[in-house]
């Protein structure tokens, strides 16, 4: 995970001090790209322990088109709690946009189903794009999309994915985002009969919150360990049929977790 650690180091040393929506303060850079060959292991940060349960359940929640935290709460995942209303609702966030994007005529579009069908139909398409940035519904969202747009690319029987993330909380959020979209790439590849290529992560405002500096420095003192391996149940070929038990991460041997506050 050298690309991720390089980003941490660069922002600590060269980032610009900026104010932010949460009032915490950040150090940030604009425009950064990381590339991970998914054949070299599953890109899960090893210099601190990540909560795999949260990463997997959140992605499954997105893919079901859900926008209420009930499913997450039932599975001991708390990462969206701070933004939910009293009924557990978040408004038309990621799951709604991925599965039920509402156009100006009121017609809903299942972007993810279209994507799977189009990869099978026309793998050389340059239009294999999913967007969560539905301008007309942004005001209704509890949190506007940070990972806002992603594109797939097929060559030599391998599927690659590039994510554009407008805003990246480098210490807490970005490791989750890397793992989540790497997992999604594997799942889409299996659902379309392809192998995996690269995951490319492009960040707009890549920032460290001021109350994460010490934790980032601590993480940089640790030596990365071997990447784990992802195993998907080979019998699942429908992207929307994956369940938690169909996904296994083997050989994950991280350093201990490093706690840090979430900026809300």
Curated annotation (Swiss-Prot):
Main location (coarse class): cytoplasm
Keyword Thylakoid carried by entry: no
Catalytic reaction list: dUMP + (6R)-5,10-methylene-5,6,7,8-tetrahydrofolate = 7,8-dihydrofolate + dTMP
Similarity comment: Belongs to the thymidylate synthase family. Bacterial-type ThyA subfamily.
Enzyme class: transferase
Organism domain of life: Bacteria
Positions annotated to bind dUMP: 21, 126-127, 166-169, 177, 207-209
Biological source species: Xanthomonas oryzae pv. oryzae (strain KACC10331 / KXO85)
Protein name: Thymidylate synthase
Location of this chain's protein in the cell: Cytoplasm
Cellular component aspect of the GO annotation: cytosol
HAMAP family, alphabetized: Thymidy_synth_bact
């Amino acid at each position: 995970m050298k690309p991720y650690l390089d980003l941490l180091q660069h922002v600590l040393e060269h980032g610009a001090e900026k104010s932010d929506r949460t009032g915490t303060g950040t150090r940030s850079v604009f425009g950064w790209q990381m590339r991970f060959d998914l054949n070299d292991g599953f890109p899960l940060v090893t210099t601190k322990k990540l909560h795999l349960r949260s990463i997997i359940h959140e992605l499954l929640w997105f893919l079901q088109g859900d926008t209420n935290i009930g499913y997450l709460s039932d599975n001991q995942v708390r990462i969206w709690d701070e933004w939910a209303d009293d009924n557990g609702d978040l408004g038309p966030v990621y799951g709604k946009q991925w599965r039920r994007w509402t156009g100006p005529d009121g017609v809903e579009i299942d972007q993810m189903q279209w994507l799977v069908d189009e990869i099978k139909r026309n793998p050389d398409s340059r239009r294999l794009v999913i967007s969560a940035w539905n301008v007309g519904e942004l005001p209704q969202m509890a949190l506007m999309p940070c990972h806002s747009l992603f594109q797939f690319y097929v060559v030599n029987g391998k599927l690659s994915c590039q994510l554009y993330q407008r805003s990246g909380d480098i210490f807490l959020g970005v490791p989750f985002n890397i793992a989540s979209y790497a997992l999604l790439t594997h799942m889409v590849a299996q659902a379309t009969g392809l192998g995996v290529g690269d995951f490319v992560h492009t960040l707009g405002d890549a920032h460290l919150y001021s109350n994460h500096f010490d934790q980032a420095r601590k993480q940089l003192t640790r030596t990365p360990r071997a990447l784990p391996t992802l195993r998907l149940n080979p019998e699942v070929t429908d992207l929307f049929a994956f369940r938690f038990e169909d996904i296994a991460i083997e050989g994950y041997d991280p350093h201990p977790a490093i706690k840090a506050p979430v900026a809300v």
